[in-house]
Amino acid sequence: QTGLSVAYDMPTLMGYDPDHPLSEGEVGKCGVSVFSIREMEKLFNGIPLDKITVSQTINGPAIILLAFYIATAENQGVDPSKLKGTLQNDILKEFTAQKEWIFPPKPSMRIITDMLTYCSKSMPYYNTISISGYHIREAGSTAAQELAFTLADGFSYIEHGINSGLKVDDFAPRLS
């Protein structure tokens, strides 16, 4: 099976359009610029999304990029339930380490929980969150702190999923 890993540029990671003043000099610099469904369709033009897995390194605007990805698949005639892949979507580590967040913690966790709910019901082969400790360590933590924060983040995602009414066995296997 073939897989692709998509790294987005800084404006996309921060939720900015490429013509925003803060995007100047950053568009396409360290990844691809995707700011619309049209751009997502260009990115995957000629690539059958039902035949590959796609890993997307995106956090703050993950729900928007997921919507673009689903729309692109549907425009290819692919049912979202057939999609395989992973979103990084680890917003909690953004607050403690990487600092690429858009919304405050509470609304961010609401979005994450909504994505867990949608994907667990509609995209059974899709990993909704890839919990990452790497950035925490790179931000200066010890190995023990990296492990502690990473596990705490994972437990928090599970707790939010359960509190929203999901059964742990319906969504936790799709966390990586």
Question: What is each stretch, according to the model?
Answer:
Residues 1-176:
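Catalytic alpha/beta active-site cores
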